[in-house]
Amino acid sequence: MRILHVIGTLDPEAGGPSEVVRVLIEYAPEHYSSEVVTLDDPDAPFLRETGFNVHPLGPIGSTYGYTKKLLSWLKANRDRFDGVIVHGMWQYCGFAVWRAMGGRVPYVVFPHGMLDPYFKHAFPMKHWKKWLYWVPVEYWVLRGAFRVLFTTEAERPLAEESFWLHQWNSWVAPFGTTPPEGDSAAQREAFFAACPGVRRRRFLLFLGRIHPKKGCDLLVDAFVKLATSDSKLDLVMAGPDAQNWRAELERSARAADVADRIHWPGMLRGDAKWGAFYASEAFVLPSHQENFGIAVAEALACGRPVLLSDKVNTSAEIAQDGAALVEIDTVEGTERLLQRWIGLPVAERELMGARASECFRSRYDMRGNAKKIVGLFETAPSRRA
């Protein structure tokens, strides 16, 4: 079978959806072949070594991503594919697929958390603008999909809270990531080369975009307040800072004289990323909204416990497996999260690490899950004229 992925950008710094595309392609069944159409500039450096066939139709001039090239390309190429996966919402990509497929080729939509009601409450003015697009366009993109894919059972009912029109064919896709390959000692060294200040320090790891949605301010503030309770524990904040927020976050750390214990290595990739997980004590994500959290699954794959807010949709099931501590997404909740970790005996931390590895193997190993997701099209009716 031939599968087409449609996504606004494959830039790793844009967040999780681009990684989803890569994983689904890499671990699809052997008899599947995949291509990607994207709105990226053909000269974008991150497209040079993708390892799969990419059709970049950019550059584009707006966040909506309109280009007349996309609809024309989809119509000209649709009959080469057995199914289409649309990644994300609120962009021209979904509308173009809806128009181009016209009942000829089944498509599914991966919202990637973009229907979470968090956005309605956090950005009310943007939500009203989305309503204007929802009724005539986005809702019908979902209604026309063979399936709308949600990555957790928690995400599915939450998606129905954002808009009162919410009839579609939903399916909970078993998602996750792939375990690291290579030598963990060499990967640790790659990380220490990127972040030498923690070579001989214990640390907690945040890995993701430096963004308000991720609760970075909660984590920094909580760490500042608890820094004296464990003077040998540091914090690593690893990720791209597209909003230039780091300077503001560092001010409170400097005021408390602990700025030298918070480290900012930027975005980590490859061995350095895996080395960060292996070298850490635990992974922390006090997010205000997290549909799945690939970094959470990556931490589990490395046998690291995870300290999560209750707004991470996978938090309850990971806590049930004994691999997570969970608290509410406030400064006080994040303080309790760190306090609970600091107060755990070493033996209990090690037991949580073993449970983390087992949790990953049983729930989030994409080597099997990817086959289930792309295999959906084998049950879809053929609708070509």
Feature roles, as predicted:
Residues A324-E332, R340-V346:
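Conserved acidic donor-binding segment of nucleotide-sugar-dependent glycosyltransferases
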